[in-house]
Amino acid sequence: MTNNSERKRLEKRIAQLCKFIGRSPWVFHVNSGSCNGCDIEIIAALTPRYDAERFGVKLVGSPRHADILLVTGPVTNQSLERVKLVYEQTPDPKIVIAIGACPTGGSVFYESPFTNAPLDRIIPVDVFVPGCPPRPEAILHGVVLALEKLAKMIKGEVPPEEGEENE
């Protein structure tokens, strides 16, 4: 599958899920000590080539407005309490996506005395997007998985499968 066809499939699925839940997902990004590689790929997913904002997937400035938390980095000792606070400030229902090798498994920082990775030791994680850094297509796939979980939480029912129409 080419990147272009994969991207179009993901875009279509995001639009379908947003229509099903009746709103657009708002996302808050938490950098917990990353090298910024994953952060750059998140921004790439929002640029015109991928254009997740076209479907309403929008970065917000406060966790109090977010449906989805994107967390990058190995969760340094300095960022540990902030990550917990941001999680608590995000209203329910919420979804947490760990973006990159650092929050998903620790990467080169695993068992370092200065980090607390993996992220699921600290807060519940719903979707893991591995990679160092993950491609924008992988991030969009993670958003699709997050939206499917969010749809189940909001609507109390399973969203239609890819290709099926909403009623």
UniProtKB/Swiss-Prot annotation:
Highest taxon above the source species: Archaea
GO cellular component: ferredoxin hydrogenase complex; plasma membrane
Cell membrane recorded as keyword: yes
Protein source organism: Pyrococcus furiosus (strain ATCC 43587 / DSM 3638 / JCM 8422 / Vc1)
InterPro entries: Complex_I_20kDa-like (IPR052375), NADH_UbQ_OxRdtase-like_20kDa (IPR006137)
General function of this protein: Probable subunit of a hydrogen-evolving hydrogenase that utilizes protons both as a substrate for hydrogen production and proton translocation. Acts by coupling the redox reaction via ferredoxin and iron-sulfur (Fe-S) clusters to proton translocation across the membrane, thereby conserving the redox energy in a proton gradient.
Positions bound to [4Fe-4S] cluster: 35, 38, 102, 132
Regulation: Inhibited by 0.1 mM Cu(2+).
Catalysed reactions, as listed in the record: H2 + 2 oxidized [2Fe-2S]-[ferredoxin] = 2 reduced [2Fe-2S]-[ferredoxin] + 2 H(+)
GO MF terms, alphabetically ordered: 4 iron, 4 sulfur cluster binding; ferredoxin hydrogenase activity; metal ion binding
Keyword Heme: no
Phylogenetic placement of the source organism: Archaea, Methanobacteriati, Methanobacteriota, Thermococci, Thermococcales
Protein's UniProt name: Probable membrane-bound hydrogenase subunit mbhJ
